[in-house]
Amino acid sequence: MSNETATLVKLSAAEQAAAIKKGDVTSRELVEAHLKVIEAAEPSIKAFLKVSGDVALEQADAFDAKSAEDKAALPELAGVPIAIKDMIVTKGIETTAASKILEGWVPPYDATVIEKLKAAGMPILGKTNLDEFAQGSSTEHSAYQTTHNPWDTERVPGGSGGGSASAVAAFEAPIALGTDTGGSIRQPGALTGTVGVKPTYGGVSRFGAIAMASSLDQIGPVSRTVLDSALLQEIIGGHDKRDSTSIPEGPRPMVAAAREGAKRDLKGMKVGLIKELGGEGFQPGVEARFGEAVDKLKDMGAEVVEVSCPHIGYSLGAYYIIMPSEVSSNLARYDGMRYGLRVMPPAGVPQTAANMMAYTREAGFGDEVKRRIILGTYALSAGYYDAWYGSAQKVRTLIIEDFKKAFEQVDVLISPTSPSTAFKFGEKMDDPLAMYVNDIATIPANLAGMPAMSIPAGLSDDGLPVGFQFIAPQQRDEVMYKPAAALEAALEDGWNGPIWNDLKTPWLDGLGK
């Protein structure tokens, strides 16, 4: 096997793990290869807020020494490096949530998912960029830098997790972790051509995930293949007593489902096309690729029927009341008193705790975070709570009931992931409502706690990736992995290879041994 950098990094995570098991490559060599790509790509991609190269190499060396004798017994993905969204705490590595208010904060503990990655022998390449506190759909709201889409560096990678998606798409990392509150894994997945998964709410521990909206947040995988996401989800999933919302049962058989799906036999599967998610407001190229992918599902034996979720049209409005309300509550802890940024009042202003908090939050939070705190505080205020927050929760219940009724008819639901392909920087920054609409197809699964996944459906007429979304019943994540893997295989047959064959990667040119 060639050790050339470009050859190594273009392997899937599963292929990299297999190469380690065979003795063709070491974990250190994989880390070194990805660090080379990061060095070459970051000037144009800017996916990482912090590259932890020394830490990754140390972890890789420890893994290589420990696994030298019995490689055959290694768990899947062992030794494969990973990137982490900077919304997940990492012991000894600065964690900022892309906010100035947490600049310089080094956590004294690991999130549960990080503990599991370390136990699996997966070196951490670094922390990836995001919209501040995961609040945004373009990664333009980071306090530090703007991440660029590898398919067109003048366009956004989606958000909030554009850093993890771009890092995986640009071959800076074979796999990554993100968080998904209203589509923050899946929408960037659609815009960058990656596979993005939001597990069932409670299926992956949130302990150590910086809270944005606690009833919606979920950690999940970002990868280039469906199988890689399944492998990673089985590693990070399972019950955690430190998370009160954690589901008692262990991970579902997602890897087996993905491998079964790759056989491309969907006979007996009923697929529901959500009629409310499509048509007006969806880019023609998105609709075209989605329709072609639906035909592929039919060709493999799936029965595709149209289903109605009549209250799904209210999901955007309900979400943008519930989410800011929880943001307002969760972000109240950033007050300059305990950790993070502290800004004292200027001379002439009383040096009180209240003034210190006000000046700290004014300096530490960006415009979008402040906007959502204000919206949430208003929705929770006396006299408005029932009219706004209470009503939104009632709508949420109706959406959950819509999904339950739909799943009485079908096994899995489908829709486009995002109404458009990647848009140019600045195009929607002055219009928050236009930005919020990017998540119209992803938000319903978060409100209902359902597992959902986006996979590449091809390139639109503008040459940019389109996402195809699967939604499965709660605690049945494996149900979406089978058709997703089948569709991935069928589409790649038609493309004569993975979507990555069409991606121009000048940062890989000239990278050798």
From Swiss-Prot:
Active site: residue positions: K85 (charge relay system), S160 (charge relay system), S184 (acyl-ester intermediate)
GO cellular component assignments: glutamyl-tRNA(Gln) amidotransferase complex
Matching Gene3D superfamilies: Amidase signature (AS) domain
Keyword Ligase set for record: yes
GO BP, one annotated term: translation
Keywords, comma-separated and alphabetical: ATP-binding, Ligase, Nucleotide-binding, Protein biosynthesis
Molecular functions (GO terms): ATP binding; glutaminyl-tRNA synthase (glutamine-hydrolyzing) activity
A Pfam family: Amidase
EC code(s) of this entry: 6.3.5.7
PROSITE patterns named in the record: AMIDASES
Source superkingdom: Bacteria
EC top class, as a word: ligase
Reactions that this protein is recorded to catalyse: L-glutamyl-tRNA(Gln) + L-glutamine + ATP + H2O = L-glutaminyl-tRNA(Gln) + L-glutamate + ADP + phosphate + H(+)
SUPFAM superfamilies: Amidase signature (AS) enzymes (SSF75304)
Tagged with keyword Ligase: yes
HAMAP family in UniProt: GatA (MF_00120)
Assembly and binders: Heterotrimer of A, B and C subunits.
Function field: Allows the formation of correctly charged Gln-tRNA(Gln) through the transamidation of misacylated Glu-tRNA(Gln) in organisms which lack glutaminyl-tRNA synthetase. The reaction takes place in the presence of glutamine and ATP through an activated gamma-phospho-Glu-tRNA(Gln).
NCBIfam families: gatA
Database matches in PANTHER family: GLUTAMYL-TRNA(GLN) AMIDOTRANSFERASE SUBUNIT A, TRANSAMIDASE
Family membership noted in the UniProt record: Belongs to the amidase family. GatA subfamily.
Protein name: Glutamyl-tRNA(Gln) amidotransferase subunit A
Organism: Bifidobacterium longum subsp. infantis (strain ATCC 15697 / DSM 20088 / JCM 1222 / NCTC 11817 / S12)
Gene: gatA
